[in-house]
């Protein structure tokens, strides 16, 4: 069935309210989750929501609480998320990075003891909406084998970058693995195969079975180049921010485990370097030059098209996910009515 964006928000907020999550936090979680579905990152949208519910039940996600700023300078900060919703922690972290960038030109905020935060691009978009460049990286629990290895040591380690422009939505949001783990989980839930050259089974053999891939490892994207980028992110979102790294990272996929991953948020104010109007105009000029070379998409075009289509056509809820959500509602004694679009 298909539901409207407003219906998705209603579902999420009704369930979180019943689980004693404050309204402000529920609003952020719902908005980030909807953003993922609208852009086409369904593996991080409402399909991921039951994992957060399980985290609340197991106590690995705290329904309420405050972040703690452990260290701070004019341009940097280190945040302890105290295991509240990762979406809320990341939102507050980027808010702080933007505030610092407004004063000093650059804001850099590290996060540890948080939780899965949904799509990284939501937070880089926050910077863009404040006429800034946004950069977000994070590590995740082991899923990726290094080149030449069989054992998962690296996470899928996403990176998102958003650039302000006058005419275009400019954003990249991607895992440094050949596939996000969430896409494997989604394929397994739907009983679908995954593409070739994405994953290995537990014996190090190529597989298109998502269940076998989840027991094995995902390949880095782009061979040794993706591996090298993931390697660096593991350090920047691990030791640099006081978070776990490598095989010590837990809780980004298994809601029964406390999350030990790290995040790094950066906001850059172009006005501290160049004239901001000229910067945006030159970004547009570059994009138009790129597009003039042929039938070319820029980073962010697909997401823009998805947003328009899904706002008009709705968001797909597959049967298994629908039953899971209705089951959660029954367990919480909620009379949840889901309106089909």
Curated annotation (Swiss-Prot):
Top-level class of the enzyme under EC nomenclature: oxidoreductase
Origin: domain of life: Archaea
Transmembrane annotation, as ranges: none
Chief location category: cytoplasm
EC number: 1.1.1.337
GO biological process: coenzyme M biosynthetic process
GO cellular component: cytoplasm
GO function term, MF aspect, one: L-2-hydroxycarboxylate dehydrogenase (NAD+) activity
Metabolic or biological pathway, per its Swiss-Prot or TrEMBL entry: Cofactor biosynthesis; coenzyme M biosynthesis; sulfoacetaldehyde from phosphoenolpyruvate and sulfite: step 3/4; Cofactor biosynthesis; 5,6,7,8-tetrahydromethanopterin biosynthesis
Localisation per UniProt entry: Cytoplasm
Keywords: Coenzyme M biosynthesis, Cytoplasm, NAD, Oxidoreductase
Reactions this protein catalyses: a (2S)-2-hydroxycarboxylate + NAD(+) = a 2-oxocarboxylate + NADH + H(+)
PANTHER family: MALATE DEHYDROGENASE (PTHR11091:SF0), OXIDOREDUCTASE-RELATED (PTHR11091)
Family of this protein: Belongs to the LDH2/MDH2 oxidoreductase family.
Function: Catalyzes the reduction of sulfopyruvate to (R)-sulfolactate. Involved in the biosynthesis of both coenzyme M (with (R)-sulfolactate) and methanopterin (with alpha-ketoglutarate).
UniProt name for this protein: L-sulfolactate dehydrogenase
Gene designation: comC
């Amino acid at each position: 069935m298909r539901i409207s964006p407003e219906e998705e928000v209603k579902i999420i907020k009704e369930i979180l309210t019943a689980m004693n999550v404050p309204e402000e936090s529920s609003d952020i979680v719902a908005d980030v989750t909807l953003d993922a579905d609208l852009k086409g990152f369904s593996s991080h949208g409402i399909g991921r929501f039951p994992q957060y519910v399980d985290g609340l039940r197991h106590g690995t996600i705290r329904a309420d609480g405050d972040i703690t700023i452990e260290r701070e300078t004019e341009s940097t900060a280190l945040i302890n998320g105290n295991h509240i919703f990762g979406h809320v922690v990341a939102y507050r972290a980027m808010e702080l990075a933007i505030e610092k960038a407004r004063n000093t030109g650059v804001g850099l905020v590290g996060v540890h003891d948080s939780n899965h935060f949904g799509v990284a691009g939501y937070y880089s978009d926050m910077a863009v909406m404040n006429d800034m460049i946004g950069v977000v990286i994070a590590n995740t629990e082991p899923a990726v084998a290094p080149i030449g290895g069989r054992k998962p040591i690296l996470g899928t380690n996403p990176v998102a970058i958003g650039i302000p422009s006058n005419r275009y939505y400019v954003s990249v949001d991607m895992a440094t693995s050949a596939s996000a783990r969430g896409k494997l989980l989604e394929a397994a839930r739907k009983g679908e195969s995954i593409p070739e050259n994405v994953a290995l089974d537990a014996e190090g053999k190529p597989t298109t079975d998502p269940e076998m891939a989840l027991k094995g490892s995902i390949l880095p994207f782009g061979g040794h180049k993706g591996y090298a980028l993931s390697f660096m992110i593991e350090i920047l979102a691990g030791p640099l921010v006081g978070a776990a790294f490598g095989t010590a990272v837990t809780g980004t996929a298994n809601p029964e485990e406390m999350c030990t991953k790290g995040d790094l948020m950066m906001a850059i104010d172009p006005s501290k370097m160049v004239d901001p109007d000229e910067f945006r105009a030159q970004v547009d000029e570059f994009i138009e030059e790129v597009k003039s070379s042929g039938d070319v998409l820029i980073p962010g075009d697909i997401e823009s098209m998805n947003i328009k289509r899904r706002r008009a056509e709705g968001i797909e809820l597959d049967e298994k996910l629908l039953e899971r959500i209705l089951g959660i509602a029954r367990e919480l004694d909620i009379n949840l009515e889901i309106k089909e679009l």
